[in-house]
Structure formats: C-alpha cells, structure tokens
Regions:
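Flexible loop/turn segments at secondary-structure boundaries
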Residues: 37-42, 111-114, 150
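Short helix/strand-bridging catalytic loops that position acidic/His residues to coordinate divalent metals
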Residues: 2-6, 123-130, 160-162
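ATP-dependent phospho-/nucleotidyl transfer catalytic cores
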Residues: 2-13, 17, 27-106
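Structural signal for well-ordered, non-membrane alpha-helices
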Residues: 19-22, 47, 178, 182
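Active-site activation/catalytic loop segments of kinase-like enzymes and analogous catalytic loops
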Residues: 135-185
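Active-site acidic catalytic loop and adjacent metal/ATP-binding pocket
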Residues: 88-136
Length: 185
C-alpha cells in the first residue's frame, strides 16, 4: 500500500481472516472449558501490558510536535490530550479491553503486518495474541487505514485525481472490511 497500489481482494480476505480467527477461537465455537484453556495458554502478560497502556494511556508521539506548526497547534493538541473527558473515555475503553475476553485477537492487525497481492493475503506478527473483545482487531486496522488516508495529503502522487481515487479506495476499505467481517462471522 505504500506504493498506492489498489488490492481488490484486501477487504474481503482481511475480513475473512479476522472473522474465522475470531469465531473459531471464541465460545461461539469452542466448548467453555476448551475456550478457557486457550485463553490461559495465550495470556501473554508481558505483551498485553504494552497494548493496555500503549494504546489507551500513553499516546505514542503525543509529546512530539512539529515546530513548523507553531505554538498554537501544540497547545491545541495538548488541550485534546489532557481533556478530562477524553482521558476518562480512554480509561473506560482500556477497562473494556482488559476485562472482556471474547476471542483470541491478533493484537497488531494493521497493513504493515499483511502481505497481499491481487489474489492472496498472508498475515504475520501474531506475538500480541491474547483474549480481548471481538472489535479490537477490526478497530485497529480501521484506525490504521484512516491514518493512511490522512497521510495521503502530503505524499507525492502523479495527479490530484490519482490521490483522490486512492483516498476513496482507502475509505471504501473501511466499509468493506466491516461489511465482510459481519457477513463471514
């Protein structure tokens, strides 16, 4: 995707991978005792704390501001980061993440951990696997795609039409991933 290539089957195959992984490692499929043994086997306490704190509490790069944006931008960012309501919502999400083990998640499911061509998809780096809510992996990749769509405003394209088409493709991936996930699950 770093080369602005369109992968026609990415949403379908990514959703199929997640839906199958989530369904077959949940109590929707497994007997309760087997499911609990699976969760115990994949407790992964060391890497789980990285996700619990890194994603929900310690915002990566939050103290790094581009001086070219000016002090007003830095103050604006800090007002969001330290907003008590937002902080409370982050703690609520973290609690849900920590206490609602519904399935084994990939834990780091984003486009850099997916190898794809026009017809095949392979997923790597499952070292963060542990029990968590169904929605985590899908939310993680959707956030990654939104970030990529935003970054396209500063990346070089041969034409503005090409840029707009690629951003539209990325936005369509979000809806397709969700729709296919629900369909396959």
């Amino acid at each position: 995707m770093n080369k602005n290539h369109l992968f026609p089957e990415l949403a379908k195959q990514g959703a199929q991978y997640l839906a199958a992984t989530h369904f077959y490692t949940s109590e929707f499929y497994l007997p309760t005792e087997e499911y609990r043994k699976l969760l115990a086997h994949f407790m992964n306490a060391e890497l789980r704390v990285v996700m619990e704190n890194g994603i929900f509490l310690n915002i990566f790069g939050a103290d790094q501001y581009d001086p070219a944006c000016g002090p007003e931008f830095e103050e604006y960012c800090k007002s969001i980061r330290f907003d008590p309501n937002l902080e409370f919502q982050r703690y609520k999400l973290r609690h849900l993440f920590m206490s609602k083990s519904e399935t084994l998640i990939h834990g780091d499911f984003h486009t850099s951990n997916i190898f794809a061509d026009d017809t095949h998809l392979k997923v790597i780096d499952m070292e963060y696997t542990f029990g968590a809510p169904f929605s985590y992996d899908l939310g993680f990749i959707i956030a990654n795609i939104i970030s990529q769509a935003c970054s396209e405003s500063v990346r070089p394209f041969d034409t503005e039409t090409h840029r707009k088409n690629y951003v539209a493709y990325l936005i369509s991936l979000i809806e397709l991933l969700y729709t296919y996930y629900i369909q396959f699950f």
